[in-house]
Curated annotation (Swiss-Prot):
Gene3D superfamilies: N-(1-d-carboxylethyl)-l-norvaline Dehydrogenase, domain 2, NAD(P)-binding Rossmann-like Domain
GO CC annotations on file: cytoplasm
Assembly behavior: Homodimer.
Catalyses which reaction(s): carnitine + NAD(+) = 3-dehydrocarnitine + NADH + H(+)
Superkingdom of origin: Bacteria
InterPro entries linked: 3-OHacyl-CoA_DH_NAD-bd (IPR006176), 3HC_DH_C (IPR006108), 6-PGluconate_DH-like_C_sf (IPR008927), 6PGD_dom2 (IPR013328), L-carnitine_dehydrogenase (IPR026578), NAD(P)-bd_dom_sf (IPR036291)
Protein family according to the UniProt entry: Belongs to the 3-hydroxyacyl-CoA dehydrogenase family. L-carnitine dehydrogenase subfamily.
Keyword NAD in record: yes
PANTHER family: 3-HYDROXYACYL-COA DEHYDROGENASE FAMILY PROTEIN, 3-HYDROXYBUTYRYL-COA DEHYDROGENASE
Protein name per its UniProtKB record: L-carnitine dehydrogenase
Role of this protein: Catalyzes the NAD(+)-dependent oxidation of L-carnitine to 3-dehydrocarnitine.
Keywords on record: Cytoplasm, NAD, Oxidoreductase
Associated pathway: Amine and polyamine metabolism; carnitine metabolism
Length: 321
């Protein structure tokens, strides 16, 4: 089917942490943005989130004409999507809610507008079941902060047209993102399945008194996390195999997978475990506010991305290589 491949107006359904991240990214790319959220105080919170993100976006580089003034908060779903070229829904992860929302969104949107959901694990075939023209409906799952992290996982449902996925990949690239096409419709997609495994193991380590939340974060940020930011998991292990590469690594360390060290099944979230996690992270946060931590995080992300891009350029590589 024919869908829009170049956008001027971006619609955001839902203006929470993820939705406001999409709004900030779209504004930074010089688009007009329409937003809707039924929550009380949503517009004020959305504008505050954009304001907090804007310094990092300025450091990263704004498109010509980019301005928070191009954000328009509207009272209904229909007013939000009627003139939009691209719709990004970021509502809570409840299938029944998304079914209802996408029935309304798809009937009010332009027939050639692409409709995307930020869902982190629900399957598009299921929640687009009542959508009008489901062939133009996809998942575009981002990562927080959406306005800085480039990864977005893209996939369609059983009735999504392949041309729609291709067009969405191009639009996300135009927004400065690194789209990753998910080959199969599976719960959790790719990145969140990996992150969930790590999160479960981290909770086990806290629950068993092996480490505090701060010590676990240190194990990541001073170790594997640094390598992951530019090399990922498989290429890192390729180097661990020495000159013989991955085959040697698999032969040498593969048998250790049978031990196993990991628990895999999530621990029971008892009150005691929740208290340990909350108290540990509160100690890590210290006197800093969430907004202050967000600004610190954003500056670190922009500097890390810039540094990696500069080193890759010296080696004849693009940032996304």
């Amino acid at each position: 089917m024919a869908v829009i491949t170049k956008i001027d107006t971006f619609a955001a359904i839902g203006a929470g942490v993820i939705g406001s991240g999409w709004v900030a990214r779209a504004l930074a790319n010089g688009l007009d943005v329409l937003a809707w959220d039924p929550a009380e105080g949503a517009e004020m919170q959305l504008r505050a989130n954009v304001e907090n993100a804007w310094p990092a976006l300025e450091r990263a580089g704004l498109a010509p004409g980019a301005s928070p003034a191009r954000l328009h908060f509207v009272p209904t779903i229909e007013a939000c999507v009627a003139d939009a070229d691209f719709v990004q829904e970021s509502a809570p992860e409840r299938e029944a809610l998304k079914l209802e929302l996408h029935e309304r969104i798809s009937r009010a949107a332009k027939p050639d507008a692409i409709i995307a959901s930020s869902t982190s694990g629900l399957l598009p075939t299921d929640f687009y079941a009542r959508a009008h023209r489901p062939e133009r409906c996809i998942v575009g799952h981002p990562f927080n902060p959406v306005y800085l992290l480039p990864l977005v996982e893209v996939l369609g449902g059983e009735r999504t047209a392949p041309d729609t996925v291709d067009a969405a990949l191009g639009i996300y690239r135009a927004l400065g993102m690194r789209p990753l096409r998910v080959r199969k419709e599976v719960p959790g997609f790719i990145a969140d399945r990996l992150l969930e495994a790590l999160w479960r193991e981290a909770l086990h380590l806290v629950d068993e008194g092996v480490a505090t939340t701060g010590e676990i974060d240190d194990a990541i940020r001073f170790g594997a996390g640094i390598r992951w930011s530019f090399m990922g998991t498989f290429l890192t292990y390729t180097l661990a195999g020495g000159e013989a590469g991955m085959r040697h690594f698999m032969q040498q360390f593969g048998p250790a997978l049978e031990l196993p060290w990991t628990k895999l099944v999530a621990p029971k979230l008892t009150d005691a475990l929740i208290d340990r996690v909350v108290e540990g992270t509160a100690e890590q946060q210290g006197p800093r506010s969430i907004k202050a931590l967000e600004r610190y995080r954003d500056e670190c992300i922009t500097e890390v991305i810039a540094a990696i891009a500069a080193v890759k350029a010296r080696h004849g590589m693009r940032y996304e290589d």
